[in-house]
Amino acid sequence: MKRVVVIGGGAAGLMAAVIAGREGAKVTLLEKMNYVGKKMGITGKGRCNITNACDMSDFIKNTPGNGKFLYGAYERFTNEDLLQLLHDAGLETKVERGGRVFPASDSALDVRNTFMKLMKHYGVDVHLEEPVKKLLVDDGVVTGVVTDRETYHADAVVIATGGKSYPATGSTGDGYMLAAQVGHKITDIRPSLVPIVTEESWVKDLMGLSLRNVELSVVAKNKVQAKMFGEMMFTHFGITGPIVLSLSHTVGKLMRKKNIGTIGLDINLKPALSPEILDKRLQKDFDLYSKKQLINGMKDLLPSRLIPLIIELAGIDPQKPINQISKEERQQIGYMLQHMPLTVKGLRPVEEAIVTAGGISLKEFNPKTMESKLVKGLYGAGEVLDIDAFTGGYNLQAAFSTGYVAAMHITHPEAF
């Protein structure tokens, strides 16, 4: 019977422990926090966005951080395989907008409890509040781990410690230290899926205002580098929300380039309308409210908190009577509605990121098996590896699939 130690009780570690146990290994899971699945519990606003119902090829497209590394893992363990495993264990799921999959109960706790039940069923030995201090390696082969309590001998070890985001959940970069101890290279650790800090101070006045069905573009070198449609929100420091988090990957990439210059953001508040149609819509509203002041004539078009700002950005007196607004001024308002400008100051720190970009270098891991090329019997799974995806369930699927593959290769190497 193979002895397997899994370090970390997040999505990747839980899957690796369950599958290795199911396939007949003697599994010990070591978690440094007081319970497992802590970070899973806060994904999807506490509902746990387990995966996405899209085609598996779309998972690669939605993983800008080294998505191609996951081809092998996704071939062996798909979103359908994951949902079947959870269904067989008694967890019902549902699909929401954008293909996002959640537990039918809307409770992340049910996902964690399902994995706890499976681990108990397969005899996984779970140790809580027991951080791993070092890996034991003899002549290029892993032989176990040392914790602050004792030494565990093993035939295989899976590092599934997560990244550096949300350190309160336990992901404080321990896995990087462990991998580096045995010779692995750690790539530049940085935030991904993180709010964006802007130069403009007026964002404070809009704090808490959410925008739906808008298009956000990232602009650098006079060119749109990336854009996304969906929801965003203003904060005291800048902007956040699903499309902001996803575009933060592009912003971070641009920030690391030399001579990139200013990175701008462009908010299109009316992406469904062409400039001509929008102008006609403005004309219609202006005809209706022709005797009012401009500040009082745009309430049908915009949230009230945005109106003064758009007028100011357009450079027009808000008290000006609408029947005195020129065609050029009206078109300038239309332009601002579709090109509301912001300037990137930076990203919030990695501790506030949903996902960490960077990690253990993938060059030193086999993408078909998740085994280290440097240390036999050592595996990496989940966010500790240099992989990061957009929001929508893609990061958790990457964790589940890599955890699955690591466990299957440990227990059935002949099948690879």
Question: Which residues make up each language-model segment?
Answer:
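A glycine-rich dinucleotide-binding beta-alpha-beta segment and adjacent secondary-structure elements
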Residues: 127-130, 134, 308-388
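Short hydrophobic core segments
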Residues: 5-7, 30, 132, 145, ...
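Glycine-rich active-site loop/strand segments that organize a redox cofactor
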Residues: 47-95
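An anion/pyrophosphate-binding glycine-rich loop and adjacent beta-alpha core
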Residues: 34-36, 41-42, 50, 56-57, ...
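Glycine-rich loop(s) and the adjacent beta-strand/alpha-helix scaffold that form part
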Residues: 156-202
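N-terminal Rossmann-like FAD-binding beta1-loop-alpha1 element of flavoenzymes
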Residues: 3-29, 406-411
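Feature captures the FAD/FMN-dependent oxidoreductase FAD-binding
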Residues: 75-156
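Glycine-rich FAD pyrophosphate-binding loop
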Residues: 21-45
